[in-house]
Amino acid sequence: MSQNTKHHRVTNYRRRDLRNTLESRLGLPVEKRRLVPQLFRLKITNIGLDVSDYTILDIIKEFGEPEYINFRDHKDSRSCISDFKDNEIATKLIEKYNNFEINGKSIQVTLLDQQKRKRDADQERRKLRHGPRGGYGSHYTKSQKPIEQRNKTVDELNAELDAYMKES
């Protein structure tokens, strides 16, 4: 049975004991977070259709080995996306090859903002999930939800717990 049918939705279930801890409210400590190495993404555009992948690959590898590379064909030109571990490699490549002419066409080399791209992808995912007319519905009204919710500190949570225990 397919999990992505229209009427059947599978959600990720978290155990109640894991869900209701202070750690889940305050967020994970910095030491426990998984660190993802930042990659610097370059976009090379306006590549002529007669320029081979190997020519562009040689230009890129002149400065260092890319972590990722992808070529795309468009109607009247081509583009290339490549990721580097080191920002220096990316900036050197931009300095040397931005507005560089290959086979009569001037290529453009730009550094892409990965954080903006991630935010845009998250927004698109939300739109797909909730559709053009909103979410799946809720028995809560919008006015019941706080407008801005900040994470409480451990001291604030302890004071709240003490006040609750004194009431009963």
From Swiss-Prot:
Keywords: DNA-binding, mRNA transport, Nucleus, RNA-binding, Transport. InterPro entries: Nucleotide-bd_a/b_plait_sf, RBD_domain_sf, RRM_dom, Yra2_RRM. It is found in: Nucleus. The keyword Mitochondrion does not apply. Residues 40-114 form the RRM domain. GO terms for biological process: poly(A)+ mRNA export from nucleus. Residues 113-152 are annotated as: Disordered. GO terms for cellular component: nucleus. Belongs to the YRA1 family. Involved in export of poly(A) mRNAs from the nucleus. Recruited to the coding sequences as well as poly-A sites of active genes. This is RNA annealing protein YRA2. The lineage of its organism: Eukaryota, Fungi, Dikarya, Ascomycota, Saccharomycotina. The gene is YRA2.
